[in-house]
């Protein structure tokens, strides 16, 4: 419970502090972009979640996400646009989510996780930067935006694509029961792997943003320094 309180407060209290600071500014910033999470949506294998028609989920991580956004939009700021980015899993070089995926594939464990049908919503780090700059330039945009690539994939496709890019043929699957045991051992949540996050960035696409890395194979090739001719 203490850890959960710390996780929640680390997000809501810092957001409130930023809001209070902006209220005191004589020349407030034109734009306040606050981080959020695509985990706010429910487990979805039946349809994609858009900003307009996505269904909010339940559970601790979802409650954190909701309170985080609530903290941002609780401030009425006449001169500052407020944007909440519901960020999917960020893929980039030098760490982050790529590290465990690469290790699994290298050790021959890069098969599907669980039944492999759960959707994986992701975004390349460069497109996170790209979205931020786009939002800064397009001054009519505000509110909630899904920060995710337009082409999410299921877990089977995710792992198969990574194996192909890394040129490793064997990838043993990890059943759900094994993932749950492993999660307990390393004190994390199996939900991180087994939850189906099917999120699409409808609003930013409608506004005209062009993704640099719309497809997972392109993202993996860039991150791992490989070209399609290799």
Question: Model regions: which residues?
Answer:
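NAD(P)-cofactor binding segment of oxidoreductase domains
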Residues: 1-32
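Active-site "gating" loop of Rossmann-like NAD(P)-dependent oxidoreductase/epimerase domains
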Residues: 35-59
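Conserved beta-loop-beta element that borders a ligand/cofactor-binding pocket
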Residues: 37, 70-93
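Glycine-rich "substrate-gating" loop/helix at the edge of Rossmann-like oxidoreductase active sites
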Residues: 56-61, 88-95, 115-125
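Alpha-helical substrate-binding/gating segment
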Residues: 102-110, 118-153
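Non-catalytic, hydrophobic alpha-helical segments
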Residues: 125-128, 132, 147, 158, ...
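Mid/C-terminal beta-alpha module of Rossmann-like enzyme folds, strongest
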Residues: 135-187, 221-230
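C-terminal amphipathic/interface module of NAD(P)-dependent oxidoreductases
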Residues: 191-230
């Amino acid at each position: 419970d203490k850890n959960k309180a710390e996780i929640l407060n680390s997000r809501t209290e810092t957001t409130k502090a930023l809001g209070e600071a902006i209220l005191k500014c004589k020349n407030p910033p034109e734009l306040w972009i606050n981080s959020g999470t695509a985990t706010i949506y429910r487990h979805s294998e039946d349809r994609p979640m858009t900003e307009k028609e996505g269904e909010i989920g339940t559970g601790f991580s979802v409650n954190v996400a909701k309170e985080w956004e609530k903290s941002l939009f609780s401030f009425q700021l006449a001169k500052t646009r407020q944007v909440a980015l519901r960020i999917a899993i960020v893929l980039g070089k030098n760490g982050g989510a790529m590290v465990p995926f690469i290790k699994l594939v290298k050790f021959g464990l890069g098969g599907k996780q669980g039944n492999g049908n759960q959707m994986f919503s992701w975004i390349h780090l460069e497109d996170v930067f790209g979205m931020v700059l786009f939002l800064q330039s397009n001054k009519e945009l505000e509110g909630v935006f899904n920060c995710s690539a337009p082409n999410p994939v299921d877990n089977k496709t995710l792992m198969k694509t990574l194996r192909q890019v890394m040129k490793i043929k064997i990838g043993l699957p990890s059943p759900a029961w094994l993932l749950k045991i492993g999660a307990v051992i390393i004190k994390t949540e199996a939900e991180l792997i087994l939850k189906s996050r099917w999120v699409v960035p409808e609003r930013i696409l409608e506004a005209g943003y062009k993704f640099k890395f719309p497809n997972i194979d392109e993202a993996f090739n860039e991150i791992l320094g490989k070209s399609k001719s290799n």
